[in-house]
Amino acid sequence: IELFDFEHLNKSNSRFDLDKCKWLNGQYINDLTEQEYIEKAAPFSNNASEKIISLTQPRVQQLSEIEKILKPILDNEYPTDHDASLKISQTPEIGVMIKELNQSFESLDPWTAENIKITIKNYADDKKIKIGSLMLPLRVCSTGVGQGTDLMPTLEAIGRNATTTRIRSRINQICTDI
């Protein structure tokens, strides 16, 4: 009490800032160990594997967001985001490139995030393009959305067969001229 001083008090009324609360909650979630996070997230995860649940930790500010983040990963029939597909359909050659890359994926063994990344990088180097130009099309074709969890571990978690099937199906929807 002796250290208390009225001079340093703010005279304005305090206010509740929901965005700041969400951000702060996200910081607490990110500070959890992976196992603590998985335990807290499990009720919101539709019985997803621990590996898939752990992918969501960096993106979550509230545990209630987990289900929405997981939906495109878990659902093979998840609808494709129109705005994201419109962005990639603007580049005519992207459909051919994603189809070629998908053919490389079909024979990739073992199916790991690291091998997926190497395959994408090698393909980009061969075509003399930046790896980033393939990331949005790959994400949209494999999950249906333009943003989400870290892509390589997500593709690993989805699995080779589901990933290649999704890409084949969506690239034909998005780039109808192929």
What are these regions (language model features)?
Residues 1-45:
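A conserved active-site cap/scaffold subdomain adjacent to cofactor or substrate pockets
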Residues 3, 23-27, 54-61, 137-141:
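Short, hydrophobic/amphipathic alpha-helical patches that form generic packing surfaces
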Residues 6-7, 47, 59-62, 126, ...:
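A short structural micro-motif
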Residues 18-22, 50, 54, 132-136, ...:
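Non-catalytic, well-ordered alpha-helical scaffold segments
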Residues 30-34, 64, 143-151:
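Short helix-capping/linker segments at secondary-structure and domain boundaries
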Residues 34-129:
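Small-residue-rich helix-loop
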Residues 114-178:
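Charged substrate- and nucleic-acid-binding regions of tRNA-handling and nucleotidyl-transfer enzymes
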